[in-house]
Amino acid sequence: MKAALFVGGWQGHAPMDFADWYKALLEANGFQVDVYETLEPLERPEDLADLDLITPIWSSARSGHREEFGNMTKAQEDGLLKLIGNGCGLAGWHGHMGDAFRDRPTYHFLIGGQFVAHPPGWPDNLQPDDDYVDYDVTICQPDNPLVRGIRSFRIRSEQYYMLTDPSNNVLATTTFSGDHLWWIEGTVIPVTWTRRWDKGRVFYCSIGHELDDLKLPQVTEMIRRGAIWAANGKRAA
């Protein structure tokens, strides 16, 4: 199987460190992996038609942030939509996929959600050290092959508050305490989900601010299974 990683955006999320780890994970599972530090190849989807999987590792790319973060053009978005619609899989995590390309609403329709906050921090919080909380991740479909055998777990990281598509197939959730924003107490937000985009399969997990988050065994296994599942969409069609 062939995968392409598109790596860039905010360096605070250390995109290349994540790309190196993820590339090794995919290669250990039989993938041939190409890494691009530009989105320009998406403008020529016909050249990428043999891909089985795309993963964006490109966070905080929007016009309100610095120009060097990069952004996605309409032509690049159209190319991505065409590739996924034709059966290529899409898989990713955290802000690298869920807080990217905010100027492209159809991109967020594609992935099924959008990051909006991580209480007590906000998207523009100037004290990021205040953003970490201990929170539970609850596996809500224990018989689903993507999470079978993975137990619910606790993690200390950014707890992503997401706006999500109700058509998502939710595999794991988290519940907000209200300790920092009282009015969201008890709110259940998806953490991991799958969805379809025409012939393509989409997988997302909101965990992953630090690379060590993805190295947690439960998270590594969800990412591994999710990527393989997404990449097999063409074969299942």
Mark where each language-model region is.
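Extracellular ligand-binding/catalytic regions of CAZymes and related secreted enzymes
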Residues: A28, D179-I189, R196-A237
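Helical hinge/lid and interdomain linker segments adjacent to catalytic or ligand-binding clefts
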Residues: K2-L5, P15-G92, H96-D99
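Residue-level signal for short, function-critical loop segments
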Residues: V7-W10, H96, G208
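A glycine-rich, often tryptophan-bearing local segment used as a flexible ligand/cofactor-contacting loop or short
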Residues: A61-R148
